[in-house]
Amino acid sequence: MGDVRTQLTPETPGRAAILNPFESPSDYCSLHEPFVSSPSVFKPSKSAATPQQFRWSIDQLAAINPIEIDAEDIHRQALYLSRAKTDKETEERRQKAIEEFFTKRTIVPSPWTQHEGKPAAPFHSTKCADLIHESPVGRVQAVQSGKSTVGCQTHLSLPVDFNLEKVLGEYFRAEETADQSQDNLSSSSLRRKLFLDGHASGSECSSPSSPPQEGPYYDPPAALGVLCSIDLSPVRCRSPTQTPSSGQFSSSPIQGGRRAFSLGSITSPTFLEKSPASVTSPSFSPIAINLGKTPDAEQKRLIFPSPETLSASTSMVNAFTRNPYIEGCSPIKSIFQIKSRSCRGNAPHRTSLFQIPFALEPHSDDKENSPPSSIKSPEGDLSSLFHQLENIVPDGHVMMGGEPIVSPTVYMQQEYLQSEELKENDTVEMVEPVEIEEEHSWPKETVATDNIPMASFMTGITFSGESSHMCMSPLAESSVIPCENSSIQVDSGYNTQTYGSCIMDGIGAETTYKENDTHISDIQNKCQHFKVKDISSVDCKNQLLEPESPEFQHSTQKSQNKLARYSLNSGMWKLTGDGAINRLNKNGGVQSPPRTLNPKSLSHFLQ
């Protein structure tokens, strides 16, 4: 053990080694390694010394040295206290001291008040104070630094019992107008505010009211007053600077191109339906916007693949993939070229093929604003179109391998012939969609009519119109369109509205009025009839892509000055009237269904 102890070197020189009795001597060799000390090493020691001063508790003192209290002393003390309360001078002196203490001295200091007799704390150090006194601006700031203006009392003092209406009535009296009737309350309701313009409006939106009384807090209202206070409509209304004549929306029917704007029971005169060229009204009706009456219709004319303007656009098929609900609230968009002229009597008119429900949107803004180059006068356009089509395909159909290819010229010529024959019957039932297996297939069941369906541009729904026959959307299932008196009534799921003055203005369709002039008579003399034959899609595609081949030229010479009739699905068009049925039986019976026609080949053929 002695040898082991001599080998140990304490960490601190001159300090005796502390041996732990709980450790064995064999562990001394590992003391230089870190280890966990035992609890006995850091145990605090208690000192046995007594405190310097000792005090007995109250209970201990009472038990050690008890004191006897005499009853006379208690009675004498009570008598003294009773006499002291009756002394008025002493009581007044005490109350005066109490009032002086609470009135002249602040018990709870307020940061808004300046205390008297209390020196202001220095805001700056000694060096800063010297600089302030040297500068004249600093001296002014030093004087004003300890002052503050705080309002602690109201200008109007109210007594305990007061009449609030009498005191505050002249300051908070609402300005009442003369016409506070039920009519104004109904017109200013939330339902009416939804259709009002929040910014401002013209005088056509509301009837003239009496001028309000002027008051001290009178604020001049806007033109609509209460009616145009809040704009709660989710659809942005047109501002009065943009629409000087067209007011707000109304549910009143259209009467001869004029609309009577009404708000509740407040009536107002009718105004013409016109809008500036820079802004178009939003579409709230299932029937599309009338492009014929708006001034911007002359500048913005969209191109649609009609028989006249089929070759004017090259991006028609891609436009159908867009969302039909991008513009406006109506799923129906009518995009046609509008050609109008004076109509004599019951002159026939023709509608172009159009697509529903997809809207046709050009890709560029320049094409929308600029008029198409293919629009001409009806006489010059038709004559030049017939001339071009006759030069391309002089025959009514081309025979190749036993399958005919029908020329669009024949369709145009026969359309004029049938327009004269079908004038007396102007009623067409609702168009039904055709279920197809492929994207560009023709319907299987066919019936002989006088129209050509553009199935390649319709994606399953084929519509056509000629003479006075109209085509409506499949959404309006209960629509009946009498076209004799130029009036239609449409129930499209939103509401029922009656439109007059012109059929084509109601649906925005392309309308071409034609006169019985010498040009039509010349076309009728050149036209001949012959039977309908099947159209082969393969032969049609090959023949259209190679119009200059010898076989094409040979076949066109055989079928010169002939006219073909087309076959349509019986479920797509339903002609009512004995005259139409008799003409169908006279011209030809039901033929075999035509085959698939490629849209690219047809567009290339017409170009």
Curated annotation (Swiss-Prot):
Which GO molecular-function terms appear in the entry? protein kinase binding
The identity of this protein, by name, is Protein aurora borealis
Q: Which UniProt keywords apply?
A: Cell cycle, Cell division, Mitosis
Which cellular component, as a GO term, is one annotated location? Answer: nucleus
Source taxonomy lineage? Eukaryota, Metazoa, Chordata, Craniata, Vertebrata
Q: Name one GO biological process term.
A: regulation of protein localization
State the residue spans of region: Disordered: 362-381, 584-607
Similarity comment: family membership: Belongs to the BORA family.
What this chain does, per the record? Answer: Required for the activation of aurka at the onset of mitosis.
Which InterPro entries would you find in this protein's record?
Aurora_borealis_protein (IPR023252)
